[in-house]
């Protein structure tokens, strides 16, 4: 009886090639597993395709809501952003996908896991660190690090030589990754940073800014302890909430990012990301958080968020440090509750009002009039003490100058 292997299967070019390649080079029965984190219609017909390509079994694991509640909401609460732009769409999904692969492998009695991540990319790190954390004795097979195929054109020829249907056209070979949170695009004209992306051809979730409506749209979000609970007064499941925001955000060209990023392995790459719903959630969360958190907590939370972002991006989700940082973030979110109103207009998100029962904004303190809580004369003593180190330093310099010291 052959040993079993679980393959992270998307039905795209890479994993379509991997099934026959594994059969030719390894003595395993291949179980193709698609983890549904919001790919939509991309999962249609995958079972037939996988079996026809040589898999002995196909499994579809649906986990959209789990993806949002356990992986997306933590990064929303942290407002985790890689290199000032990237909202971790692929980074947050990979640990969950790898976790589900391990679970299926254990159920099926498999002893190995294979993936289609390239030897130059981040995903190989994310997949394999997760497997090592959850199933340290599993064998991991990464065909891109073993075979002599070096391009997408060679992959296409490999399939054509074996009379296997190619799941893409040669003239439309963007490398895309779609989930509930975002859609990424790489390849073609994007490989040269001098080129402007062909947005008319590229975008799938969003309008171009030129094609976005000429009238803006208001959207109101409600948060409880940092987690979105309602949009425009309506309650949604976690996945449906993101889908709804994707729809209205995409309509108004919100969340389109062109990023030159530094991969974990040290290579610079370029990608265009569409994250319409996520961009709205980050903007709304930021508004209410600035209303409800004090300066010291807010500033230190930025430090924690930066480190958390690094852990998530580099595949270190299942680590004690990531859990500890998320626990800190959660502790800061106990008062991040209230309503935020935003206006969406041609790629812009414009704050239009925020309220919270835990607001730290005091109108009488913020106004120019003198109130009971604050006397303008109090500022003199504060400035004297706050500026004392500056004064002492200046006096020292004057004294040194008089003494002829430099």
Swiss-Prot record:
Localization, per the record, is: Cytoplasm
| Enzyme class, spelled out | ligase
Which pathway, per its entry?
Answer: Amino-acid biosynthesis; L-arginine biosynthesis; L-arginine from L-ornithine and carbamoyl phosphate: step 2/3
- Residues annotated as binding ATP: 8-16, 116
Q: Does the keyword Amino-acid biosynthesis apply?
A: yes
Catalysed reaction per UniProt? L-citrulline + L-aspartate + ATP = 2-(N(omega)-L-arginino)succinate + AMP + diphosphate + H(+)
An example GO BP is:
L-arginine biosynthetic process
Question: Might you give the EC number(s) for this enzyme?
Answer: 6.3.4.5
Q: Does the keyword Thylakoid apply?
A: no
Domain of life assignment: Bacteria
**GO function terms (MF aspect):** argininosuccinate synthase activity; ATP binding
Matches recorded under InterPro entries: Arginosuc_syn_C, Arginosuc_syn_N, Arginosuc_synth, Arginosuc_synth_CS, Arginosuc_synth_type_1_subfam, AS_cat/multimer_dom_body, Rossmann-like_a/b/a_fold
Q: Which GO terms describe its cellular component?
A: cytoplasm
Q: Which UniProt keywords apply?
A: Amino-acid biosynthesis, Arginine biosynthesis, ATP-binding, Cytoplasm, Ligase, Nucleotide-binding
Identify the residues that bind L-citrulline: 86, 91, 122, 126, 175, 184, 261, 273
Q: Where does L-aspartate bind?
A: 118, 122-123
Family as reported in the entry's similarity comment = Belongs to the argininosuccinate synthase family. Type 1 subfamily.
**Subunit text:** Homotetramer.
| Protein's UniProt name | Argininosuccinate synthase
Supply the source organism's classification. Answer: Bacteria, Pseudomonadati, Spirochaetota, Spirochaetia, Brachyspirales
Q: Which gene encodes it?
A: argG
């Amino acid at each position: 009886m052959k040993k079993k292997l679980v393959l992270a299967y998307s039905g795209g070019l890479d994993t379509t090639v991997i099934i026959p390649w594994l059969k030719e080079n390894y003595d395993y029965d291949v179980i193709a597993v698609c983890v549904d984190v919001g790919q939509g219609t991309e999962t249609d017909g995958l079972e037939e395709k996988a079996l026809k390509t040589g898999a002995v079994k196909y499994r579809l694991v649906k986990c959209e809501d789990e993806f949002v509640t356990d992986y997306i909401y933590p990064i929303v609460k942290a407002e985790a952003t890689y290199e000032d732009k990237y909202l971790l769409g692929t980074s947050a999904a990979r640990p969950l996908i790898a976790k589900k692969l391990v679970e299926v492998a254990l159920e099926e009695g498999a002893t190995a896991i294979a993936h289609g991540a390239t030897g130059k990319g981040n995903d190989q790190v994310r997949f394999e660190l997760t497997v090592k954390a959850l199933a340290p004795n599993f064998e991991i097979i990464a065909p891109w690090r073993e075979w002599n195929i070096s391009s997408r054109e060679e992959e296409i020829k490999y399939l054509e030589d074996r009379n296997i249907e190619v799941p893409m056209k040669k003239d439309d070979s963007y490398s895309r990754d779609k989930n509930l949170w975002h859609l990424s695009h790489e390849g073609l004209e994007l490989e040269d940073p001098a080129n402007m992306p062909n947005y008319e051809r590229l975008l799938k979730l969003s309008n171009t800014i030129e094609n976005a409506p000429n009238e803006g749209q208001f959207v109101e979000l409600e948060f409880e302890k940092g987690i979105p609970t309602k949009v425009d007064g309506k309650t949604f499941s976690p996945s449906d909430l993101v889908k709804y925001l994707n729809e209205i955000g995409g309509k108004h060209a919100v969340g389109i990012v062109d990023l030159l990023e530094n991969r974990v392995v040290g290579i610079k790459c370029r990608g265009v990301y569409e994250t319409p719903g996520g961009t709205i959630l980050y903007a709304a969360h930021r508004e209410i958080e600035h209303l409800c958190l004090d300066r010291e907590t807010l500033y230190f939370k930025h430090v924690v968020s930066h480190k958390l972002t690094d852990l998530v991006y580099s595949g270190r989700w299942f680590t004690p440090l990531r859990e500890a940082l998320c626990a800190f973030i959660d502790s800061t979110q106990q008062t991040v509750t209230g309503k935020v109103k935003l206006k969406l207009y041609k790629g812009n998100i414009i704050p239009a009002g925020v309220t919270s029962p835990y607001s730290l904004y005091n109108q009488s303190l913020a106004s120019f009039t003198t109130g009971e809580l604050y006397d303008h004369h109090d500022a003199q003593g504060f400035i004297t003490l706050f500026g004392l180190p500056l004064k002492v330093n200046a006096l020292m310099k004057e004294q040194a100058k008089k003494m002829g010291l430099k």
